[in-house]
């Protein structure tokens, strides 16, 4: 089992790292008390090989030796990788002032500045025990995400799942769509009596639509649009991209166009999915 432990000062980006780890398939637990770590790993044994926990100052042992002892007593076969995130006092003060969140060490008579300084003193020994110390003072969330991926995977590439989905406007638009294309202006097989009972998955319908210049041109234009902007969407650290294609009933045109786009991108580095909402119960 691989265990990633994320510690560090409050406001330095631990939650960002946990989100990255979750995207990479890790089972993540936020603010886990270290004495419960053995129990957690035992419970997860056999169900997952990737576990990540974050630990804040309230859950850290007061003595350095106790901290090392708990890490040394991990279950046999556990591969530990540890991160410590830090930022300058000035940056942390600015971040907390902007978000107006309460610092974990804030007390009625303790100022934010004092809480930040006190946490630095408490965690300084821990910062010297980890595998990777990362100063996030000058990193945005995307820079930090890329840095974590590079450490764990050896590259910053992230698998983008592209979901092409057909639908019928008469049944409502999909709320999860990132891009939506209306193909109701294209020639409609519904008006061909022999094609009406079929769908865009059937060869006669596909043949009919493939012979329509406007259909081919529109598919080509969508392909070029997506190919142009996909690199920019990847740099925005997306995990999923949903492209919705809609016609009137979601039976013919939208299904065909969705299938063609999925085939065009099938050999890309992305994971491609095709779904037909109005055919899903068939």
UniProtKB/Swiss-Prot annotation:
UniProt: ATP binding residues: 8-15
A GO MF term: ATP binding
Binding site for GTP: 56-59
Key words of the record: ATP-binding, GTP-binding, Nucleotide-binding
One of the Pfam families matching this protein, by short name: RapZ-like_N
Matching InterPro entries: P-loop_NTPase, RapZ-like, RapZ-like_N, RapZ_C
Family: Belongs to the RapZ-like family.
Main function: Displays ATPase and GTPase activities.
PANTHER family, A to Z: RNASE ADAPTER PROTEIN RAPZ (PTHR30448:SF0)
The protein's name in its UniProt record: Nucleotide-binding protein in ptsN-ptsO intergenic region
Species, as recorded: Shewanella violacea
């Amino acid at each position: 089992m691989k265990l990633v432990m994320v510690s560090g000062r409050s406001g330095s980006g631990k939650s960002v790292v946990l989100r990255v780890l979750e995207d990479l398939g890790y089972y993540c637990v936020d603010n886990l008390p270290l004495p419960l770590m053995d129990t957690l790993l035992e419970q997860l044994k056999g169900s997952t090989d990737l576990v990540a926990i974050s630990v804040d100052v309230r859950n850290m042992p007061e003595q350095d030796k106790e901290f090392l002892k708990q890490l040394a007593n991990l279950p046999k076969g556990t591969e530990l990788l540890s991160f410590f995130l830090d930022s300058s006092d000035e940056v942390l003060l600015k971040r907390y002032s902007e978000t107006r969140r309460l610092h974990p060490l804030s007390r009625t008579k303790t100022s934010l500045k004092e809480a930040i300084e006190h946490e630095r003193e408490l965690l300084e020994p821990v910062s010297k025990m980890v595998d990777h110390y990362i100063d996030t003072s000058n990193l945005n969330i995307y820079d930090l995400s890329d840095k974590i991926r590079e450490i764990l995977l050896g590259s910053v590439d992230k698998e983008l799942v592209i979901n092409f989905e057909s639908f019928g406007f008469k049944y409502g638009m999909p709320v999860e769509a990132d891009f939506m294309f209306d193909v109701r202006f294209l020639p409609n097989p519904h008006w061909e009596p022999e094609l009406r009972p079929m769908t865009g998955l059937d060869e006669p319908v596909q043949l009919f639509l493939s012979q329509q210049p406007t259909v081919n041109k529109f598919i080509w234009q969508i392909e070029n649009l997506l190919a142009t902007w996909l690199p920019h969407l990847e740099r925005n650290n997306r995990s999923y991209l949903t492209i919705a294609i809609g016609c009137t009933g979601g039976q013919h045109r939208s299904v065909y166009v969705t299938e063609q786009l999925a085939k065009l991108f099938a050999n890309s580095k992305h994971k491609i999915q095709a779904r037909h909402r109005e055919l899903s119960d068939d």
